[in-house]
């Protein structure tokens, strides 16, 4: 699956999910979020592998970007062409991303924007093309685990013949409820 250009502009904080209905989101189309003037914060999901030409270009209020843990192709010029408004970039990959020199097209003030990288990777980023231009490279702890999962145990009812019921039965009989035999009177 991929994120494509929509007619309703994205606003505020946008999180591109890793999956939608169990399918991985692997690509952000060129111009997908182009000129989204009200987009302020962007989090790119961990399954995204490709971001197209000017995917987030001309989003003049974009100030905070979080890049995925996985390796992603950022080889298109002007991908973050955002009028020098980006103030923070959070890189979650322990290996510095390979990016095209024109990725920001002058949209990042390297002296003001803070580049956050995983603990222990500051030197690697400082030695990498494009990333070495940042004056402020700060290490931060990066969580790569799944957190805040709410599991709601649903009540499951079946007849003795194995037919699944959508609710607790109101007709007397013997049923299976969450794997146990239950008598309903």
Model-identified regions with their sequence ranges:
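GGW-centered surface loops in extracellular recognition modules
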Residues: 1-9
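A recurrent domain-boundary module in secreted/ectodomain proteins
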Residues: 127-143
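A structural signal for leucine-rich repeat
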Residues: 79-82, 102-108, 128-129
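C-terminal tail/sorting-segment detector
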Residues: 174-185
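Consensus positions within tandem repeat domains that build extended binding/scaffold surfaces
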Residues: 29-32, 52-57, 76-79, 103
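Structural signature of tandem-repeat unit edges
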Residues: 9-27, 36-50, 59-74, 83-98, ...
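Residue-level detector of functionally pivotal "anchor" positions at catalytic/ligand-binding pockets or at interdomain
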Residues: 138-161
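Short, small/polar residue-rich loop motifs at catalytic or cofactor-binding pockets
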Residues: 21-22, 150-153, 168-170
């Amino acid at each position: 699956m991929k994120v494509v250009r929509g007619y309703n502009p994205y606003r505020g904080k946008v999180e591109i999910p890793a999956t939608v209905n169990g399918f991985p989101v692997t690509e952000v189309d060129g111009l997908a979020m182009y000129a989204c003037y009200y987009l302020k914060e962007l989090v790119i999901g961990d399954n995204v592998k490709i971001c197209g030409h000017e995917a987030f270009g001309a989003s003049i209020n974009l100030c905070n970007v979080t890049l995925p843990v996985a390796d992603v192709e950022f080889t298109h010029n002007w991908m973050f062409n955002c009028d020098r408004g980006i103030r923070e970039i959070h890189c979650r990959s322990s290996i510095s991303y390979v990016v095209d020199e024109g990725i920001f097209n002058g949209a990042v003030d390297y002296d003001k924007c803070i580049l956050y990288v995983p603990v222990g990777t500051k030197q690697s980023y400082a030695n990498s093309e494009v990333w070495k231009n940042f004056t402020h490279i700060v290490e931060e702890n990066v969580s790569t685990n799944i957190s805040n999962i709410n599991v709601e145990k649903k009540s499951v009812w079946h007849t003795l013949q194995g037919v699944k019921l959508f609710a607790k039965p109101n007709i007397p009989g013997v049923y299976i409820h969450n794997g146990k035999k239950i008598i309903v009177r």
